[in-house]
Curated annotation (Swiss-Prot):
Signal peptide stretch: none
Residues given in the record as ATP binding sites: 127-134
Domain of life: Bacteria
Protein name as catalogued: ATP-dependent Clp protease ATP-binding subunit ClpX
UniProt xrefs under Gene3D superfamilies: 1.10.8.60, ClpX chaperone, C4-type zinc finger domain (6.20.220.10), P-loop containing nucleotide triphosphate hydrolases (3.40.50.300)
Domain ClpX-type ZB as annotated: residue spans: 1-54
Name of the encoding gene: clpX
Keywords, in A-Z order: ATP-binding, Chaperone, Metal-binding, Nucleotide-binding, Zinc
Organism: Corynebacterium efficiens (strain DSM 44549 / YS-314 / AJ 12310 / JCM 11189 / NBRC 100395)
Molecular function (Gene Ontology), one example: protein dimerization activity
Biological role: ATP-dependent specificity component of the Clp protease. It directs the protease to specific substrates. Can perform chaperone functions in the absence of ClpP.
Family: Belongs to the ClpX chaperone family.
Length: 426
C-alpha cells in the first residue's frame, strides 16, 4: 500500500513521461512539469530551425539596390545607361517581391491591406551585338541565381518538330543542378523573340506552329504555372518521371532586334510621307534606338506579337547600337575585356601583347562593317592573333607582340620584339 502511494506521489515529465527519479532535474510550471532532457531537446530543435532560417537568409544575401546593380553592370557592360537603369529597377523589384513572398511563408495574407505583387517580365529591344545577352548574364552573375538562354527560333508548338517550350525550363533546371527551389528563383533569357512574330497582324486561320503558336505556348510559363518537366527532354523519353517546376517567381527577359519595327513606329508618329520612295523617318540619320524608345504595345502588335504576349512583358528597355568609340571601350574597359583576356593568354607564354590605338579602332571598324557589333569582336581578334599564337610557344626569343592598325586590317604582319632587339637598343 505504501509502495502504491509512493508511485502516485512521484512527479513525471509532462512531455516524455519519465519520473523525477529517471531524470536529473524536473522543473514545475503550474500543473505541468518538464525534465532537463526535454529542455535540451527543445533547445536543439530551436537552434536547428534558427540555423536553417539564417542559412536561407545568408544564401539569398542582401538584395543590392538599383544603383548598386547598375554600378556592377558598369564594370562589365559599356554604355547602355538607360537600359541599365530600367533593368536594375525591374530586377530589384522582382527579387524584392520574392523576399516579401518568402517572409509570409509563401501564403497570401488575408489582410485587406495586403497588396499582391505581380511579376514584371522584361522585353529588351536592340540590334545584334549591342549587349542584350551579356546584360542578362551579368545580372544573373551578380544575383547568384541560375541562368538559362533559349533561342526562340528553335521552339515550336507542342506536337510539332522542334523544341517544346518546356525545354527552356529544363535548361534552367540543369543550370541549377536540378535544385528545384533554386531554379524557381532563376532568370531565363529568350533571344530572337522577334522571329516568332505571327505572319500577319490578323489572327491566322492556318496553323502557325513556329510563330503565334509558340507565343501562345509561352504565355503560361511567363505568367506563372506549375509545369511538368521531363528531366531527359520530353519527346525521346515519354515514360520518364516528371519534375514539377513553378514558374511564378522565375524572371523572364525576352529580347530581339525587331528589324522593321522602327518603320511601324515612324508611321504611327506621322512620319510617313506621300509619294514613292519617301523616307519613313523625318531625319534620315535618326538612330533606330531613339525611335525604339517611343515603342507602344500597338506597334508590337502590328509587328506580329499577340496582345496577350505583350501583356506579360510590362517592362520595356532599349539598347543602343554601338559606334566605333563604344566598341573600342568594349575591347578595353570592362573588367574581363577581350584585350585583357588575350593579354593574359600571352603572359602565360612570357610574352607581352600590345595593341596600338589605331589597331583598336581598326578592329572596331571591322565589326561595324560586318554589322556584328560587340558579338563579332572575338572572332576578329581570333583571326588576327591565331597565327601568332600558333608560333609564340616555339619562340623563346620573343618578348613582345605589337598589333597595329595595318596588322588588324591584314596589311602587315605583327611586330615581334625579341631579346636580341632589346639588347641592341640597350
Amino acid at each position: 500500500m505504501a509502495r502504491m502511494q509512493e508511485s502516485a506521489d512521484l512527479l513525471k515529465c509532462s512531455f516524455c513521461g519519465k519520473s523525477q527519479k529517471q531524470v536529473k532535474k524536473l522543473i514545475a510550471g503550474g500543473a505541468v512539469y518538464i525534465c532537463d532532457e526535454c529542455i535540451e531537446l527543445c533547445n536543439e530543435i530551436i537552434e536547428e530551425e534558427l540555423g536553417q532560417a539564417q542559412g536561407q537568409e545568408e544564401e539569398h544575401g542582401e538584395l543590392p539596390k538599383p544603383s548598386e546593380i547598375s554600378a556592377f553592370l558598369d564594370k562589365y557592360v559599356v554604355g547602355q545607361d538607360q537600359a541599365k537603369r530600367i533593368l536594375s529597377v525591374a530586377v530589384y523589384n522582382h527579387y524584392k517581391r520574392l523576399r516579401a513572398h518568402e517572409q509570409i511563408g509563401g501564403r497570401r495574407r488575408r489582410d485587406e491591406e495586403d497588396t499582391e505583387l505581380i511579376k514584371s517580365n522584361i522585353l529588351l529591344l536592340g540590334p545584334t551585338g549591342s549587349g542584350k545577352t551579356y546584360l542578362a548574364q551579368t545580372l544573373a552573375k551578380l544575383l547568384d541565381v541560375p541562368f538559362a538562354i533559349a533561342d526562340a527560333t528553335s521552339l515550336t508548338e507542342a506536337g510539332y518538330v522542334g523544341e517544346d517550350v518546356e525545354n527552356i525550363l529544363l535548361k534552367l533546371l540543369q543550370a541549377a543542378d536540378f535544385d528545384v527551389e533554386r531554379a524557381q528563383r532563376g532568370i531565363i533569357y529568350i533571344d530572337e523573340v522577334d522571329k516568332i512574330s505571327r505572319k500577319s497582324e490578323n489572327p491566322s486561320i492556318t496553323r502557325d506552329v513556329s510563330g503565334e503558336g509558340v507565343q501562345q505556348a509561352l504565355l503560361k510559363i511567363l505568367e506563372g504555372t506549375v509545369a511538368a518537366i521531363p528531366p531527359q527532354g520530353g519527346r525521346k523519353h515519354p515514360n520518364q518521371d516528371f519534375i514539377q517546376l513553378d514558374t511564378t517567381n522565375i524572371l523572364f527577359i525576352v529580347a530581339g532586334a525587331f528589324s522593321g519595327l522602327e518603320k511601324i513606329i515612324g508611321e504611327r508618329r506621322g512620319k510617313k510621307g506621300l509619294g514613292f520612295g519617301v523616307e519613313v523617318a523625318s531625319k534620315k540619320d535618326e538612330e533606330k534606338e531613339d525611335i525604339f524608345k517611343d515603342v507602344r504595345p500597338e506597334d508590337l502588335v502590328k509587328f506580329g506579337l499577340i496582345p496577350e504576349f505583350i501583356g506579360r512583358l510590362p517592362v520595356v528597355a532599349t539598347v543602343a547600337n554601338l559606334d566605333q568609340e563604344s566598341l573600342v571601350k568594349v575591347l578595353t574597359e570592362p573588367r574581363n575585356s577581350l584585350v585583357k583576356q588575350y593579354k593574359r593568354l600571352f603572359e602565360m607564354d612570357d610574352t607581352l601583347l600590345t595593341f596600338t590605338d589605331d589597331a583598336l579602332e581598326a578592329i572596331a571598324d571591322l565589326a561595324l562593317e560586318r554589322k556584328t557589333g560587340a558579338r563579332g569582336l572575338r572572332a576578329i581578334l581570333e583571326e588576327i592573333l591565331v597565327p601568332i599564337m600558333y608560333d609564340i610557344p616555339d619562340r623563346d626569343d620573343v618578348t613582345e607582340v605589337v598589333i597595329t592598325g595595318e596588322v588588324a586590317r591584314g596589311e602587315a604582319e605583327p611586330e615581334l620584339i625579341t631579346h636580341t632587339a632589346e639588347e641592341k637598343t640597350a
